[in-house]
């Protein structure tokens, strides 16, 4: 077995070589991808921040309902391109519920050595609107609150660039914010926007047609543009959608204050368009189509799209004089990595974290790779993992699997390395997809090496198991084209959705 240092070097090599510029969106913390200056955005409290390369492109989503009393402190730590520490700046945004009244304007300033001036954040508190992930458990509880508030976009304005950039993984919705996150157990991206008519302007204050608030005005229009690649970013910064989506699902539900018209059409017409990677525009739901109305009335419409999607546009117009009390628009993009020519890559390397550092509730739109450091990495997904957990066996497995296969870890190679973290304290599904130049025999040697290594470290694994939930390994033969012949797999332990532990897997090899 290799040393921890070698393991760390190996994992870092894998991550650095395969990472495409992009951002991993988290609920609480965010990291830039490799190739950009290393930095770490930490938000104390129930908030979410996302950062792109540098400290010039950040969008923060702050929910005051979770900290109506107490302080919200934002801290920026990290290193710039010269590996010099970035100054940490802490600013108290608010301390009492009165600070979060509708219309309040708050600001946050962060300075760093790799900027030409201070970056600033500003936003406005809006009443009557909330945005949550589709799979966010808080969505239900928030919907029951009488007073729903959320900070609108807090966008860092770059003094260096002189422009406001949205991050690559953040869709833009008129009148508010929403963000993409991977589903609870499947490889998908979701964005949900919930609009509720209410006090302090409600939907009208967000730019929706006046009729939606109860003063019906026929003919009003609203256009929402959901930008998967966001504004002012190049395509290579958002490659997590660099492939054809299998299914695009739109869930639209309406709560009307009046009965439907005799035609059975909902009070709002929909036109859904998309822009693919070649900048061609197509219409998925024609304007006024009866089938579209029926589909949306039923709550869901699905469309198969064969080209990579850049933008998804939802256009709405009021069809009659009915008032709408609430409008919920959800977009789910679901794909299988094996079906995508260049699988989504959004790897993140955690470096230099000191013991006790917490990574809170990571929400990744694609994949996540973790590099252990001498200081020990603490990885959290809605629940803590102790900082003294030894992840070496996990990385030793990767090393043994590839020891005899010198691979060209370059963006041009076809090597695919996917890891997924789904559960609070365990790597619930580890999917490996390698494309080796040496083919089956090389992989077979790697599997045998792993089997020997695993048997030699049973005691070590049992000690780890006392601290961490069992580490599950999912190796799907059907997802690895060049390993389709079961005879050459060395009896892979897991097929399809079946999962087992590393040591159990080794016993089959």
From Swiss-Prot:
It is found in: Virion. Keywords: Capsid protein, Outer capsid protein, Virion. It comes from the Viruses. One of its GO terms (cellular component) is viral outer capsid. This is Putative outer capsid protein VP5. The lineage of its organism: Viruses, Riboviria, Orthornavirae, Duplornaviricota, Resentoviricetes. The gene is S5.
């Amino acid at each position: 077995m290799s040393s921890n240092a070698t393991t760390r070097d190996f994992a870092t090599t894998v991550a650095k070589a395969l990472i495409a510029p992009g951002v991993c969106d988290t609920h609480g913390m965010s990291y830039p991808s490799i190739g950009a200056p290393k930095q770490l955005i930490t938000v104390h409290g129930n908030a979410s921040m996302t950062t792109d390369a540098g400290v010039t492109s950040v969008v923060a989503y702050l929910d005051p309902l979770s900290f109506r009393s107490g302080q919200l402190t934002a801290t920026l730590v990290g290193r710039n391109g010269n590996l010099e520490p970035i100054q940490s700046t802490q600013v108290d945004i608010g301390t009492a519920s009165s600070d979060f009244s509708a219309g309040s304007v708050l600001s946050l300033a962060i300075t760093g050595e790799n900027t030409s001036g201070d970056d600033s954040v500003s936003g406005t508190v809006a009443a009557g609107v909330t945005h949550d992930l589709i799979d966010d458990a808080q969505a239900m509880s928030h919907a029951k609150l009488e007073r729903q508030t959320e900070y609108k976009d807090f966008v860092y304005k770059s003094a260096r660039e002189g422009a406001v950039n949205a991050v690559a993984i953040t869709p833009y919705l008129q009148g508010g914010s929403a963000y993409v996150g991977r589903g609870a157990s499947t490889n998908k991206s979701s964005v949900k926007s919930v609009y509720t008519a209410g006090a302090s302007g409600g939907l009208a204050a967000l730019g929706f047609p006046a009729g939606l608030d109860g003063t019906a005005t026929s003919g009003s229009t609203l256009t929402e543009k959901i930008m998967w690649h966001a504004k002012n970013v190049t395509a290579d910064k958002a490659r997590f959608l660099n492939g054809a989506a299998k299914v695009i699902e739109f869930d639209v539900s309406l709560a009307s204050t009046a009965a439907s018209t005799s035609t059975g059409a909902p009070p709002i017409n929909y036109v859904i368009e998309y822009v693919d990677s070649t900048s061609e525009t197509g219409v998925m739901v024609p304007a006024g189509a009866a089938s579209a109305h029926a589909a949306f009335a039923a709550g869901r419409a699905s469309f198969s799209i064969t080209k990579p999607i850049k933008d998804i546009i939802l256009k709405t117009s009021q069809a009659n004089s009915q008032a709408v009390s609430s409008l919920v628009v959800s977009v789910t993009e679901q794909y299988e990595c094996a079906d995508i020519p260049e699988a989504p890559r959004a790897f993140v390397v955690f470096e230099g974290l000191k013991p006790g550092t917490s990574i809170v509730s990571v929400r990744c739109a694609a994949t996540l790779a973790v590099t252990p450091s001498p200081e020990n990495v603490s990885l959290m997904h809605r629940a803590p993992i102790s900082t003294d957990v030894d992840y070496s066996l996990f990385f030793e497995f990767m090393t043994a699997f590839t020891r005899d296969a010198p691979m060209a870890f370059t963006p041009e190679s076809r090597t695919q390395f996917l890891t997924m973290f789904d559960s609070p304290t365990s790597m619930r599904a580890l999917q490996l997809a390698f494309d080796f130049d040496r083919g089956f025999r090389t992989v077979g040697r790697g599997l045998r090496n792993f089997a020997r290594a695993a048997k030699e470290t049973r005691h070590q694994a049992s000690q780890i198991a006392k601290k961490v939930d069992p580490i599950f390994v999912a190796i799907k033969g059907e997802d690895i084209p060049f390993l389709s012949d079961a005879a050459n797999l060395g009896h892979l332990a897991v097929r399809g959705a079946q999962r087992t532990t590393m040591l159990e897997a080794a016993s089959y090899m």
